[in-house]
């Protein structure tokens, strides 16, 4: 069988967990529509978002594994839109390891990110490949083409703006605000039904800045919020931001009371018994108790 783009879309599309987030009847009038690829636990439930206009589209992030990236390719192909831009929202590899696969199928799409995120990727890429490459095997990227730095803080899609916000503090942890459809793509700031990845927020100030960023999102009064990581079926609304902010507050309360990571893990598991992504809690507890370097 000849392996073509159409074949790829037909074979992989059933596995791409996409979610239309425009309300019933609104798709005919909304200037932009959204589809979400939600990866499984092996890829930390990371999300990629396809933002579509009438003819063109912007992709927010590319997935972690090659398999994730191929499923995202299928989602784009099935949309029948012209992919103009791939925006890398975060410096974590589960947001950008799929660049090489996406570029194979959409060579004309520009791959961009903010200057702070690019700087962080450049500083950590070699280590990330060293850590994850052997674990991922054939699912690891063959190459990782670097994105280019975005000029300004907006991406325009058919006249509608996608605004990059949260650049004031920890600018590599930004988020995307789409005012025309009152939607936030929260990146690593927002989790849905999962333990937060606190290993990258090792000081009280970093966590306070993170919490403030979540407060800024709430103030925008979004009608739709797409978390950077979420359990399947999680509501795509501001409750995910509230969940993340409450979790951070609880983490801050429990951390000084815990004598070690085991006690902190127990406290957070008790507070959030149904939360997924235990690896985030286990590593975050060890790092923030000084038992592990990250």
Model-derived features with residue positions:
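Metallo-beta-lactamase
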Residues: 64-65, 120-243, 247-250
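N-terminal secretory signal peptides that target proteins for export/translocation
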Residues: 1-7
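Accessory terminal helices/loops
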Residues: 22, 120, 219-224, 232-294
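Conserved beta-strand hairpin/beta-sheet module of binuclear metal-dependent hydrolase folds
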Residues: 29-78, 175-178, 182-188
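Active-site metal-binding motif and surrounding structural segment of the metallo-beta-lactamase
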Residues: 67-113
């Amino acid at each position: 069988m000849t392996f073509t783009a159409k074949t790829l879309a037909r074979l992989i599309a059933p596995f791409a967990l996409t979610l239309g987030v425009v309300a019933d009847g609104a798709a005919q009038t909304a200037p932009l529509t959204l589809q979400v690829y939600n990866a499984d636990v092996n890829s930390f439930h990371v999300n990629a978002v396809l933002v579509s206009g009438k003819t063109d589209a912007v992709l927010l992030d590319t997935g972690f594994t090659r398999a994730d990236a191929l499923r995202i390719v299928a989602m784009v192909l099935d949309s029948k839109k012209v992919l103009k831009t791939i925006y890398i929202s975060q410096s974590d590899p589960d947001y950008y390891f799929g660049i090489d696969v996406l570029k194979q199928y959409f060579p004309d799409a520009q791959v961009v990110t903010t200057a702070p995120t690019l700087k962080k990727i450049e500083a950590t890429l070699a280590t990330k490949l060293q850590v994850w490459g052997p674990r991922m095997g054939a699912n690891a990227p063959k190459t990782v083409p670097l994105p280019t730095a975005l000029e300004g803080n907006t991406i325009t899609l058919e006249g509608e703006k996608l605004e990059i916000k949260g650049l004031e503090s920890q600018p590599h942890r930004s988020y995307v605000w789409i005012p025309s459809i009152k939607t936030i793509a929260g990146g690593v700031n927002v989790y849905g039904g999962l333990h937060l990845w606190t290993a990258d927020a090792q000081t009280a100030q970093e966590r306070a800045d993170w919490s403030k960023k979540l407060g800024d999102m709430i103030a925008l009064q979004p009608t739709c919020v797409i978390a950077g990581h979420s359990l399947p079926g999680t509501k795509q609304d501001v409750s995910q931001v509230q969940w993340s902010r409450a979790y951070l507050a609880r983490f801050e309360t429990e951390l000084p009371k815990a004598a070690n990571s085991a006690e902190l893990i127990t406290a957070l598991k008790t507070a959030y018994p149904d939360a997924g992504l235990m690896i985030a809690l286990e590593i975050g507890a060890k790092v923030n108790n000084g038992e592990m370097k990250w």
